[in-house]
């Protein structure tokens, strides 16, 4: 069975914010960890958008449409952590979000997202765009 990452801990007052979706969530994107930003209309988009990447999104249900409100997480914990490509997080490794929405261990042109603990948990602390 494939790992299904979830937000394990989050403080809604300081660890996330809400925004409407700019586009429908694709079925292929369900149960994957994505890096999100906002477009020039303030709607949530996969990738950097107009704002630069702001947080992490994991959707678990099909049928979410443009305009639906979602949570974008900026701080908290994800468990079990897997990259957007489905690779399990490596303990002690830093992970980065990219302009295309993917999250991996490549720092080049990426925003710091967090690091992984010994039990495979991502400690989420998204870097604020400059």
List where the protein language model places each region.
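Surface-exposed, low-hydrophobicity beta-strand/loop segments enriched in small/polar/acidic residues
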Residues: 1-130
């Amino acid at each position: 069975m494939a790992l299904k990452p979830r937000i394990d801990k989050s403080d809604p007052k300081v660890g996330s914010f809400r925004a409407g979706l700019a586009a429908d969530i694709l079925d292929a994107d369900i149960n994957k960890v994505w890096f999100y930003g906002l477009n020039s209309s303030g709607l949530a988009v996969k990738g950097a958008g107009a704002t630069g990447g702001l947080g992490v999104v994991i959707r678990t249900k099909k049928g979410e449409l443009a305009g639906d409100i979602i949570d974008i997480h900026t701080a908290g914990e994800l468990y079990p952590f897997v990259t957007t490509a489905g690779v399990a997080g490596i303990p002690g490794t830093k992970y980065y979000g990219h302009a295309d929405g993917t999250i991996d261990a490549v720092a080049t042109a990426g925003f710091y997202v967090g690091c992984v603990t010994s039990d495979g948990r991502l400690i989420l602390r998204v870097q604020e765009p400059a």
